[in-house]
Design a protein with these regions (language model features):
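RNA substrate-binding interface of SAM-dependent RNA methyltransferases
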Residues: 71-131
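N-terminal positively charged helical leader segments and presequences
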Residues: 1-70, 122
Length: 131
């Protein structure tokens, strides 16, 4: 069975190169090479099938083969607001699971009795993208 590899590229249609972190994962970790197939997503519902056309150092170029249709079962918009807990792992787990079930948007709120008043959203964002 063929493994499907998804990569997050924010501007997938207008770009021809994977972002540095994704390129490193494709070339070094998965050891992909010229002609290998990969799937791109922009995080907003666009999915593309692409092929690696070039690699130089830590850079990976691709060509879009086709845009994949995505049927969305529910056309609503689900927004969750949550107060960060004392333990970051719980916030990360909640964000990951909520993304998996189809939550569209997150807001972190600072409540009167919140134990954590600042949250590093970059790690949570990476977890949500990978989910």
């Amino acid at each position: 069975m063929k493994e499907v590899r998804y990569f997050y590229v924010p501007d997938a249609l207008h770009s021809t190169e994977l972002p540095p972190e994704e390129a490193r994962h494709a070339l070094r970790v998965l050891r992909l090479g010229m002609g290998d197939e990969l799937y791109l997503m922009d995080g907003e519902g666009l999915f593309l099938r692409a092929e690696i056309t070039g690699q130089t150092g830590h850079r990976c170029q691709y060509a879009v083969v086709e845009e994949l249709p995505q049927a969305r079962a529910w056309l609503g918009h689900l927004h969750i607001a949550m107060a960060p807990t004392k333990m970051n792992e719980r916030v990360e787990w909640m964000s990951e699971k909520a993304t998996e079930i189809g939550v569209d948007e997150f807001s972190f709120v600072d409540c009167q009795f919140s134990e954590r008043h600042q949250l590093k959203t970059d790690r949570v964002e990476r977890i949500v993208v990978s989910a």
